[in-house]
Amino acid sequence: MLRLCFFISFMCLVKSDTDETCPSFTRLSFHSAVVGTGLSVRLMLYTQRDQTCAQIINSTALGSLNVTKKTTFIIHGFRPTGSPPVWIEELVQSLISVQEMNVVVVDWNRGATTVIYPHASSKTRQVASILKEFIDQMLVKGASLDNIYMIGVSLGAHIAGFVGESYEGKLGRVTGLDPAGPLFNGRPPEERLDPSDALFVDVIHSDTDALGYKEALGHIDFYPNGGLDQPGCPKTIFGGIKYFKCDHQMSVYLYLASLQNNCSITAYPCDSYRDYRNGKCVSCGAGQIVPCPRVGYYADSWKEYLWDRDPPMTKAFFDTAETKPYCMYHYFVDIVSWNKSVRRGFITIKLRGEDGNITESKIDHEPSAFEKYHQVSLLARFNRDLDKVAEISLLFSTGSVVGPKYKLRVLQMKLRSLAHPDRPHLCRYDLVLMENVETSFQPILCSQQQM
């Protein structure tokens, strides 16, 4: 809540621009945020035919909305400056590009624009009521609830939940993008988004220590980088306004990345981020019957696997790169050592492709105990995917700055891709790693018995 207060104080004046040919998202000024705004909801329809020019619709005039097709509602959250969300147009275009559908932008900027956050949050039920009135008319015209999809950002996630609750959870899907935490944390299910609000509820939590909601709210809850500080976002207040909103907005950009086919972000079901980082959560993907869940638009492809769980809910964790498309590529590094004594330490791995590109991963795990003839499997994350690896470099460190330097005697090292399980496993045998000294070698294909 403290960061929210600072966030509001950093807002600056936004000019109004109303001279437009096509209806556009309501643009208000910071003055409007200071004096407050009454609630007014506009529904803006985009279709395959009208991708850039919205049509204003309402419960008495559905316009060119095709009730036989999927309808996706985009619901924004708190707007302390009055400006439109910077991501709204890109999200509309990206959704229409992947599937022919109706996209309805729920513009409640008059109501969400205020410097007093509780005033905005108090209007969420009213917005949900207006949306229900509109959907009721869609149903009269022949639409089906399971063909309705709601994407809610921040406060918008709870609005989507309230709409779903009014239909007893029969909506097809609700996606919550960093659902708002302040004034909702600790509230009972009927006062926030929860799994009973739709047939499938997926959530991305990207700012759980400030503006977002920490606990699980859906059938599957994704926690990028543990749901806390996001790579590429400022770490101190000296980053300006971006410090306050970057982590919160990252949920939207990760969702957008899933629509743009640059890469497929996968996550790993797990009890905690710590267990995920330590490589304990790979019950999906390479070598497994169940694929790993995909983050974003295609998350619902995993719902059939959730039905086998009791309850049908899970948390999933993943890491991201600092820049678009945010994908990290996961590998397992399996090491069998033959030291007489146990060696505890960390491994850094660097890969060089045949094209000369290099990518490095500090395998960020707790100190591993390398015991004689015992295999240790380490999860490594790279921000570049190398199709053909020409050279591998390993560095062993105990993390100690004083005392003797140790050796790690490696009987076998195996590198295997989780993202591409069909790729051949790469091995190296009989290797000695001197502490804090990088050792490079050309890998060979593992023998068939070790695949």
Swiss-Prot record:
InterPro entries: AB_hydrolase_fold, Lipase, Lipase_LIPH, Lipase_N, TAG_lipase. One of its GO terms (biological process) is lipid catabolic process. Keywords: Cell membrane, Disulfide bond, Glycoprotein, Hydrolase, Lipid degradation, Lipid metabolism, Membrane, Secreted, Signal. GO terms for cellular component: extracellular region; extracellular space; plasma membrane. The active site is at residues 154, 178, 248. Disulfide bonds join 233-246, 270-281, 284-292, 427-446. It is found in: Secreted; Cell membrane. It is a peripheral membrane protein. It holds the Pfam family Lipase. It is an enzyme of class 3 (hydrolase). Its EC number is 3.1.1.-. Interacts with TTMP/C3orf52. Belongs to the AB hydrolase superfamily. Lipase family. Hydrolyzes specifically phosphatidic acid (PA) to produce 2-acyl lysophosphatidic acid (LPA; a potent bioactive lipid mediator) and fatty acid. Does not hydrolyze other phospholipids, like phosphatidylserine (PS), phosphatidylcholine (PC) and phosphatidylethanolamine (PE) or triacylglycerol (TG). This is Lipase member H.
